[in-house]
């Protein structure tokens, strides 16, 4: 199958956030170029039997609308308020403090109910409580004489006038604070229940903001819930067991890690990927690598631009086959062990000067970063290839050269390629921070095997007319099994 290398992928549109919407809006049509689409519709196209059917990324989750999430939260709150004999607002503060783990709350309540309320910051700690030292009927903020009925306080009895409370709450809500609105007294930890704050907000606009911030804080504190990070998306993801696993919103199709809400990053764990991304953003030395799109052919020295995702390059002038990453001859590149992904440590570096160690550290970082960035660029180029395949299939169907079913395997191959390369990209931060030893050697071996099969698949996808369907689907199966094996052995978070 030949494809036009100049066409571009389309952009996806995102819907506005509307927490008051009663019904879910219809899902938008999938954009074939989106990274979020990598995992869709692939599993059914690669036959799995026995142990091969095990998917290390399998993870049960549910997508909830705003109303469904609110209903689930209110159900917990109503039940707990009834058992603890507290107001609904206080019950919510207790739930937030204990991450909505009701069984733990009830156990603590049975053992020491007073301490539970202190820990939830709804009652003062008797041993540390400092009563107000201001004259009676005086506001402790503006120091004005105030009628008793205009003085308001929480359980700590720190009294302030209604005007100061209104100003305090309004400023905090404008700054995006929800559950965090607290007593104005210095060093007083007590939080204000929502039924205390709402009457103090002067207009409906602020009250609506406060509702949204409360909902955000309630969801973020719940150990089984995460807000979808998609732009203006109101959906909430619910799981039974919180883990660093891939979830996807069924409204905006955003794919992310449930635990950290960042882009899905298996096999790298959440803390490591944060460290890696911070390092990439901070290190100015990477700028030259980010902008590098061309290299010289190692045989005839003609300048070559990479316009596809495959790292198996063929010079258009001399027809020399070489690796884009290391410029090695492709014929001997992966004959026994795919060396291109493995960094060779200098065993004597600990005995050398600090300057030499710094140079070695930079060399190591650039080695991994260049490969990380190269696969990122390959993903973007292969997304364009996917779009062109999609358009080519449409053209063939319109010309009665087969049905969608006949050509669907080409799209599935491009999707699986992106899925595998996406995993491969995130193996490089994992390897960069990994301690040397037998486990790292095993990881590098599996990483190399995966990379070799991905490049074989990429080569065949970009030259689909030269390979029959069985050959392509066999390569898909091999690449996916390499990917699953690596994740099964190393994605243990």
UniProtKB/Swiss-Prot annotation:
GO terms for cellular component: cytoplasm; nucleoplasm; nucleus; ubiquitin ligase complex. Zn(2+) 6 binds at residues 323, 326, 333, 340. Its EC number is 2.3.2.31. Pathway: Protein modification; protein ubiquitination. Residues 359-493 are annotated as: Ariadne domain. Changing residue 39 to A: Impaired ability to ubiquitinate proteins. Zn(2+) 4 binds at residues 257, 260, 265, 270. Zn(2+) 2 binds at residues 156, 158, 183, 188. Interacts with (neddylated) CUL5; promoting association with cullin-5-RING ubiquitin ligase complexes (ECS complexes). Does not interact with other neddylated cullins (CUL1, CUL2, CUL3, CUL4A or CUL4B). Interacts (via RING-type zinc finger 1) with UBE2L3. Interacts (via RING-type zinc finger 2) with UBE2N. Interacts (via RING-type 2) with GFI1B. Interacts with GFI1; prevents its ubiquitination and proteasomal degradation. Members of the RBR family are atypical E3 ligases. They interact with the E2 conjugating enzyme UBE2L3 and function like HECT-type E3 enzymes: they bind E2s via the first RING-type zinc finger, but require an obligate trans-thiolation step during the ubiquitin transfer, requiring a conserved active site Cys residue in the second RING-type zinc finger. The active site probably forms a thioester intermediate with ubiquitin taken from the active-site cysteine of the E2 before ultimately transferring it to a Lys residue on the substrate. The Ariadne domain inhibits activity by masking the second RING-type zinc finger that contains the active site. This is E3 ubiquitin-protein ligase ARIH2. It comes from Homo sapiens.
């Amino acid at each position: 199958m030949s494809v036009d290398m100049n066409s571009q992928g389309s952009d996806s549109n995102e819907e506005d956030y509307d927490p008051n919407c009663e019904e879910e809006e219809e899902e938008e049509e999938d954009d074939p170029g989106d990274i979020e689409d990598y995992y869709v519709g692939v599993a059914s196209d690669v036959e799995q039997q026995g142990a091969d059917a095990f998917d290390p990324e399998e993870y049960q989750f549910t997508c909830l609308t705003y109303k469904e999430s609110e209903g689930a939260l209110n159900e917990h709150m109503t039940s707990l308020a009834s058992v603890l004999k507290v107001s609904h607002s206080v019950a919510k503060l207790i739930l937030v403090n204990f991450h909505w783990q009701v069984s733990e709350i009830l156990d603590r309540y049975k053992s020491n109910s007073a301490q539970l309320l202190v820990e939830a910051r709804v009652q003062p700690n008797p041993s540390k409580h400092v009563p107000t030292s201001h004259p009676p009927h005086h506001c402790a903020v503006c120091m004005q004489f105030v009628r008793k009925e205009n003085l308001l306080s929480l359980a700590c009895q720190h009294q302030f006038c209604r005007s100061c409370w209104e100003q305090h709450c309004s400023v905090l809500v404008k700054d995006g604070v929800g559950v965090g609105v607290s007593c104005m007294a210095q060093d007083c930890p007590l939080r204000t229940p929502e039924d205390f704050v709402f009457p103090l907000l002067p207009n409906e606009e602020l009250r609506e903001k406060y509702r949204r911030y409360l909902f955000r804080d309630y969801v973020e504190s719940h150990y089984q819930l995460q807000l979808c990070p998609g732009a203006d998306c109101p959906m909430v993801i619910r799981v039974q067991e919180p883990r660093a696993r891939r979830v996807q919103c069924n409204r905006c199709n955003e794919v992310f890690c449930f635990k950290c809400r960042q882009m899905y990053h298996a096999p790298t764990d959440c803390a490591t990927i944060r460290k890696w991304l911070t390092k990439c953003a901070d290190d100015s030395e990477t700028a030259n690598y980010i902008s590098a799109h061309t290299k010289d052919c190692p045989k005839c020295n003609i300048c070559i631009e990479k316009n596809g995702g495959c790292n198996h390059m063929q010079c258009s002038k001399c027809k020399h086959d070489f690796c884009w990453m290391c410029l090695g001859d492709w014929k001997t590149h992966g004959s026994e062990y795919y060396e291109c992904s493995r960094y060779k440590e200098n065993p004597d570096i600990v005995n050398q000067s600090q300057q030499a160690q710094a140079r070695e550290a930079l060399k190591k970082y650039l080695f991994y970063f260049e490969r990380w960035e190269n696969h990122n660029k390959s993903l973007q180029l292969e997304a364009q290839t996917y779009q062109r395949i999609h358009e080519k299939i449409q053209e063939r169907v319109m010309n009665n050269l087969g049905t969608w079913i006949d050509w669907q395997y080409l799209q599935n191959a491009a999707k699986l390629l992106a899925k595998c390369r996406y995993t491969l990209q995130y193996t490089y931060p994992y390897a960069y921070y990994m301690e040397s030893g037998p486990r790292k050697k095993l990881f590098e071996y599996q990483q190399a095997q995966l990379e070799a099969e991905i490049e074989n698949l990429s080569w065949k996808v970009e030259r689909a007319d030269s390979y029959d369907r069985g050959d392509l689907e066999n390569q898909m199966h091999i690449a996916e099994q390499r990917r699953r094996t690596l994740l099964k052995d190393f994605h243990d978070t």
